[in-house]
């Protein structure tokens, strides 16, 4: 980042073509190479391909020149995406350049964000371009006190040029935007990527960084009205609501929010008259919960559609917005089946010498793991069958024992990490059991023995200590409780660090 900043400060910002020369810098592609190595996915590949060759400025120049020669090289042979020319796959050239291209696009936005933080200015709205979600914390505390929820699918742009216009507001660089148009024309069906899961999956796999950047730049515009409403109707007004949108500023937000007192509100009556609402998003799925009436939500629905179509030129349909009432409605979000559960309780009250038992009902936000999609994902990855019975993974038997255990352990920790927000842990225990027994069967198959014999030889404590590593770390964080491990399994713990697409969530 310091090299980028030094380059831009030497007059690069005053030039019209300040981004395009960065495409020929070798360290840009070295950075993309490191990101490719460090990225982890649910279906972890056995090897990392596509980045096995060194980059040079001469190679990049040749690749960009070949990309622009659409008529003679790319689109001349049957319009087949798997066509090979000059000994390479055409898609391979696009993947090489697009990864570095995405990093170059993020440079000016990252520098503006860093400068705004140092000067303590308001965070710009493009600060969450690297995140795939906008989640305001304490969701489990807000939802039980709200009455209605709107389930919304964000609209899609009517034309690819609309995405270029969005970026033109931030990046004044003609050659860079022309190169972006070239990528759009190659993936002519990218307009369906926002709503079509199949095409989105293919594009995101081939160009993950570019896909994330372009998609989130569009979503920032589409959700800007929701952020405005969230600011206007919130009860807790912290120093700045900008950091609430970005997962990297979560801990900074915790420092700003303190105990709210009545004297902190300048207009307490006006605040409490406003209908409180809560807003969360994952990819194109948006949830807006409100204390208002059903009629108010209907007005919001009409307002959103007109605003998107008339102001942003985003096409939206009434069927993409559904209004439901708590607590009758259960919804899928972030891989959880969430609902509001009414918990009965009794309160003992005393008036003079008389005692009374008052029955009351307390709403509680429940998050349950949707076990069926997870088992389906594990079955497709060959960890179990469709019934959830663990099986061995033959393709890993050629690896060393430590590598096999490390892969299973990493996957188990990732799932525990992701689904730690569940209020009921039984499904999470089942997932751990499937992975643990699948690991044992894989090792037993490698050594040509039975699972029982293998476990007796190594001891079951070895697996327990390995899979309990994360729980021990978290128990130290909760050491102030009398029984931290029990508290860990009983209460949900949320980790807001989702910065990429999650295959398990996409199956819902």
Curated annotation (Swiss-Prot):
Any GO MF annotation of the entry: RNA binding
Subcellular locations according to the entry: Plastid, Chloroplast
One GO BP: RNA splicing
Single GO cellular component term: chloroplast
Stored InterPro entries: Domain_X, Maturase_MatK, Maturase_MatK_N
Keyword DNA-binding: no
Main location: plastid
Record carries keyword Hydrolase: no
Keyword annotations from UniProtKB, A to Z: Chloroplast, mRNA processing, Plastid, RNA-binding, tRNA processing
Alphabetical list of Pfam families matching this protein: Intron_maturas2, MatK_N
Family designation: Belongs to the intron maturase 2 family. MatK subfamily.
Annotated function: Usually encoded in the trnK tRNA gene intron. Probably assists in splicing its own and other chloroplast group II introns.
Protein name: Maturase K
Provenance organism: Wolffia arrhiza
């Amino acid at each position: 980042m310091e090299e980028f900043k030094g380059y831009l400060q030497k007059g690069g910002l005053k030039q019209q073509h300040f981004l395009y020369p960065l495409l020929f810098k070798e360290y840009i592609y070295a950075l993309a190479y490191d990101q490719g190595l460090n990225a982890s996915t649910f279906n972890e590949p056995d090897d990392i391909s596509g980045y096995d060759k060194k980059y040079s400025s001469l190679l990049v120049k040749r690749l960009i020149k070949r990309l622009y020669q659409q008529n003679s090289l790319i689109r001349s042979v049957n319009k087949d995406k798997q066509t090979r020319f000059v000994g390479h796959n055409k898609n391979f050239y696009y993947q090489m350049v697009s990864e570095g291209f995405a990093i170059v696009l993020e440079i000016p936005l990252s520098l503006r964000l860093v400068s705004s933080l140092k000067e303590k200015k308001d965070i710009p709205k493009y600060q969450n371009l690297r995140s795939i979600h906008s989640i305001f914390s304490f969701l489990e505390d807000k939802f039980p006190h709200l009455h209605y929820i709107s389930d919304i699918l964000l609209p899609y742009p009517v034309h690819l040029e609309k995405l270029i216009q969005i970026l033109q507001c931030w990046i004044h660089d003609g050659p860079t935007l022309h190169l972006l148009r070239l990528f759009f024309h190659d993936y002519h069906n990218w307009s369906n990527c926002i709503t079509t899961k199949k095409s989105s999956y293919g594009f995101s796999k081939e160009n993950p960084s570019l896909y994330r950047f372009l998609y989130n730049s569009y979503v920032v515009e589409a959700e800007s009205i929701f952020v405005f409403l969230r600011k206007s109707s919130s009860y807790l007004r912290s120093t700045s609501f900008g950091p609430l949108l970005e997962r990297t500023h979560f801990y900074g937000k915790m420092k700003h929010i303190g105990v709210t007192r009545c004297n902190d509100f300048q207009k307490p009556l006006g605040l409490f008259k406003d209908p409180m609402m809560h807003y969360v998003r994952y990819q194109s799925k948006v949830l807006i919960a409100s204390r208002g009436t059903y009629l108010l939500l209907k007005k919001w629905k009409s307002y959103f559609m007109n605003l998107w179509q008339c102001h942003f030129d985003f096409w939206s349909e009434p069927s993409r917005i559904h209004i439901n009432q708590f607590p009758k409605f259960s919804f899928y979000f972030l891989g959880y089946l969430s609902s509001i559960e009414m918990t009965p309780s009794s309160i003992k009250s005393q008036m003079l010498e008389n005692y009374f038992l008052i029955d009351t009902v307390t709403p509680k936000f429940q998050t349950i793991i949707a076990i069926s999609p997870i088992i389906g994902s594990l079955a497709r990855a060959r960890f179990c069958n469709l019934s959830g019975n663990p099986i061995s993974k033959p393709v890993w038997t050629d690896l060393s024992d430590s590598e096999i255990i490390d892969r299973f352990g990493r996957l188990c920790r990732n799932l525990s990490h992701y689904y730690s927000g569940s209020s009921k842990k039984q499904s999470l225990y089942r997932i751990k059991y499937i992975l643990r027994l699948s690991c044992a069967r894989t090792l037993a198959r490698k050594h040509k023995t039975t699972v029982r014999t293998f476990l007796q030889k190594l001891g079951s404590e070895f697996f327990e200590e390995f899979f309990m590593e994360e729980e021990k770390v978290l128990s130290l964080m909760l050491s102030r409780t009398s029984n931290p491990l029990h508290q860990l399994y009983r209460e949900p713990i949320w980790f807001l660090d989702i910065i990429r697409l999650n295959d398990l969530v996409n199956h819902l």
